[in-house]
Curated annotation (Swiss-Prot):
Its EC number is 4.2.1.10. It comes from Salmonella paratyphi A (strain ATCC 9150 / SARB42). The lineage of its organism: Bacteria, Pseudomonadati, Pseudomonadota, Gammaproteobacteria, Enterobacterales. This is 3-dehydroquinate dehydratase. The gene is aroD. Involved in the third step of the chorismate pathway, which leads to the biosynthesis of aromatic amino acids. Catalyzes the cis-dehydration of 3-dehydroquinate (DHQ) and introduces the first double bond of the aromatic ring to yield 3-dehydroshikimate. It catalyses: 3-dehydroquinate = 3-dehydroshikimate + H2O. Belongs to the type-I 3-dehydroquinase family.
Length: 252
């Protein structure tokens, strides 16, 4: 399987990489969080731009990105505006969403962008091509905060992300039962064994799905999200606890 290397971090081999989310609402809280996060041990920093209030100003967004980059120059930075329809904090037009991502790509400050699969195939493909032309990787994502689709449907979505050029396909779903968690793990394993030619990230959310955040190395998920202070999605656990369990499973 092809790995993805970002700032000397090899995603897709060994232990799942730990991603943490920074969710400051203004420039001061972004800076404070970024400085505080330097004390934590993790692999990738996701900036959840949908928590930032001044998204109407691209300049403000880029200023905040610069603050984060200056605070942590060596950590891979993932730029994520999560849409309201997929569990994010704000509603913006597709055009604004795409222009924010392009501005982030142009800035040279981010290593990866998160691009939602259901933004529209033509726009997704154009943005992937634009990112790759600027040496920025694409995590292509889909989130369902209400249910868990069938394993077949989840595999189809992940395969579509590959077909559209995602460097790392990602899916996160909400379980309504323990069986749903098994469905997500089944889809992950099937993808890894039969279709994936690049790293994939999957998770089942909430308390019920916590096992999926820990068992990535077993079933084929290349990264997992942990919390430094505040969780960005239900079911995330503290980064130190997360790393301990990942290491136990890795060394077993």
């Amino acid at each position: 399987m092809k790995t993805v290397t970002v700032k000397n971090l090899i995603i897709g081999e060994g232990m799942p990489k730990i991603i943490v989310s920074l969710m400051g609402r203004d420039i001061n809280s972004v800076k404070a969080e970024a400085l505080a996060y330097r004390e934590a041990t993790f692999d990738i920093l996701e900036w959840r731009v949908d928590h930032f209030m001044d998204i109407a100003s691209t300049q403000s967004v880029l200023t905040a990105a610069r603050v984060i980059r200056d605070a942590m120059p060596d950590i891979p930075l993932l730029f994520t505006f999560r849409s309201a329809k997929e569990g994010g904090e704000q509603t913006i037009t597709t055009q604004h969403y795409l222009s924010l991502n392009r501005a982030a790509i142009d800035s040279g400050l981010v290593d990866m962008i998160d691009l939602e699969l259901f933004t529209g195939d033509a726009d997704v493909k154009a943005t992937v091509d634009y990112a790759h032309a600027h040496n920025v990787y694409v995590v292509m994502s889909n989130h369902d905060f209400h249910q868990t689709p069938s394993a077949e449907e989840m595999v189809l979505r992940l395969r579509k992300m590959q077909a559209l050029g995602a460097d790392i396909p990602k899916i996160a779903v909400m379980p309504q039962s323990k069986h749903d968690v098994l469905t997500l793990l089944t889809a992950t394993l099937e993808m890894q064994q039969h279709y994936a030619d690049r790293p994939v990230i999957t998770m089942s959310m909430a308390k019920e799905g916590v096992i999926s955040r820990l068992a990535g190395e077993v079933f084929g998920s290349a990264a997992t999200f942990g919390a430094v202070k505040q969780a960005s999605a239900p079911g995330q656990i503290a980064v130190n606890d997360l790393r301990s369990v990942l290491m136990i499973l890795h060394n077993a």
